[in-house]
Amino acid sequence: MDVYGLIGNPVGHSLSPPMHEAGYGTLGIDARYVTFEPAPDDAVAAIGGAGALGVAGLNVTVPFKQDALDAVDPAPLAERIGAVNTVDFGPLRAGDADRPRGHNTDAAGVKRAFSHHDIELAGRDAVVVGAGGAGRAAAFALADAGATVHVANRTAERAVDLADAVPGATGGGLDDLGDRIAGADVLVNATSVGMDEPEATPVPADHLHGDLAVLDAVYAPIETRLLREAAAAGATTIDGAWMLLFQGVEAFEIWTGADAPVEAMNAALRAELE
């Protein structure tokens, strides 16, 4: 039996175990998905220890995504983003590498969420609200897919710093957010606004329009105020569970080499969110 898992602190809230185990069960893969909660400064040691104990793959969540870079051979996109959320011990176990391979499937989660909803990103103008970890993954994902990206953040300097790292991107504060969105095709909320206060929104309703595709990274609640108001404006809306699903699907496929059973994994995830 193969063991996969998640390291983070805390991890008790994670929806990854039922999602991944639904995938293993559907395909008849003999595997389990478990959680590990090391001390906040023990990411490198924890990843090394997991590999030594025969763990086949790990997802990595806060606060370890940046520190995990020091424990892996990062894939190019993970290195550019500056964060790892998926560790594959396969090359190390096969003797083909000295360290496990590190990936960032958060970026793939963004791209595949749009693709699943038939949204073409190449040549589009995109606005990402938020310059934290989710914002970095979204900005790089959109640029990698061929979109022109503008990052908007309450602290403009953080948006500019992120934009400087993303090819062709611009960054700034929130003062001109309405004008930026007016000319955009794609909008991503990469902040946590709408999670703890469900009636809060990062984008005023009068900024939204019917030519937008709107992805909200918040997945609890599934239907945020932003998505309700975007739908009312005629926009295409994509809830955060799709992004969560497809980052997990991408990790599943890296680890197993099999096509993930997306429908089964999605059903398991949404059952947990109900």
From Swiss-Prot:
Alphabetically ordered keywords of this record: Amino-acid biosynthesis, Aromatic amino acid biosynthesis, NADP, Oxidoreductase
Which InterPro entries does the record associate with it?
Aminoacid_DH-like_N_sf, NAD(P)-bd_dom_sf, SDH_C, Shikimate_DH, Shikimate_DH-bd_N, Shikimate_DH_fam, Shikm_DH/Glu-tRNA_Rdtase
Could you cite one Gene Ontology molecular function of this protein?
NADP binding
Query: What's the EC number here?
Result: 1.1.1.25
The chemistry this enzyme catalyses reads: shikimate + NADP(+) = 3-dehydroshikimate + NADPH + H(+)
Q: Which residues form the active site?
A: K65
Q: What SUPFAM superfamilies does the database record attribute to this sequence?
A: Aminoacid dehydrogenase-like, N-terminal domain, NAD(P)-binding Rossmann-fold domains
Q: Which Gene3D superfamilies match?
A: Leucine Dehydrogenase, chain A, domain 1 (3.40.50.10860), NAD(P)-binding Rossmann-like Domain (3.40.50.720)
**Source organism, top-level taxon:** Archaea
The signal peptide, as residue positions, is none
The UniProt record gives the binding positions of NADP(+) as: G130, A131, G132, G133, A134, N153, R154, T155, A156, E157, R158, A217, G240
Associated pathway: Metabolic intermediate biosynthesis; chorismate biosynthesis; chorismate from D-erythrose 4-phosphate and phosphoenolpyruvate: step 4/7
Q: Which residues bind shikimate?
A: S14, L15, S16, T61, N85, D106, Y219
Q: Name one GO biological process term.
A: chorismate biosynthetic process
Spell out the subunit comment. Homodimer.
Function, as annotated, reads: Involved in the biosynthesis of the chorismate, which leads to the biosynthesis of aromatic amino acids. Catalyzes the reversible NADPH linked reduction of 3-dehydroshikimate (DHSA) to yield shikimate (SA).
State the similarity comment.
Answer: Belongs to the shikimate dehydrogenase family.
Task: Please identify the protein, giving its name as recorded.
Answer: Shikimate dehydrogenase (NADP(+))
Species per Swiss-Prot/TrEMBL record: Halorubrum lacusprofundi (strain ATCC 49239 / DSM 5036 / JCM 8891 / ACAM 34)
